[in-house]
Amino acid sequence: NIYGGTYSLFHEYFERWGVIIEEVDTTDYEALDAAVSGESVKGGAHGCPAKAVYFEVLTNPLLQVNNVTAIAGIAHRHGAIAIVDNTFVTPYLQQPLDQGADIVIHSATKYLAGHSEVNAGLVVVKDDELGKRVYFAQNRLGGVLAPNECDSVRRGIQTLALRMDRQQENARAISSYLLLHPLVKSVHYPG
């Protein structure tokens, strides 16, 4: 229950590079704690605790709601950092850094820019040390957005509140309709 592009990145690249990826239901705090501590089957077999816990505030595609404070707390208890994808929720509705996340990522292509004219992402960090580490990687790898694309994201953010409010209204109306429709078996709506 994670965005397909992220799933592919983890399993097609990171694992090839020797990174151990363990998938855990992030609403099952006992299983998550075991995985992060290195006591689960996959982590324990390698005898190493996790260095990071990655999760989405609202998962893609099933919209499972994750508790940032609880998950970040488990990560921190074992010395791991909490990396949160806040794309679906946006900073308009939630600020995961205020809830204990160490790194927050957004696909700016989606809600932030909002007009399907930019391919962009952003990384927000809780402190200078993490910021320096992200900058170092960005500087070496070249993942820097051009000025025109930056301006497109800026323009999109100006209408973010209006668009998010309307999208929430529409989602409520559509899900209410679908919940009562006799041919619909299930509706994934977190609101």
Give the ranges of each region predicted by the language model.
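Conserved PLP cofactor-binding pocket of PLP-dependent enzymes
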Residues: 191
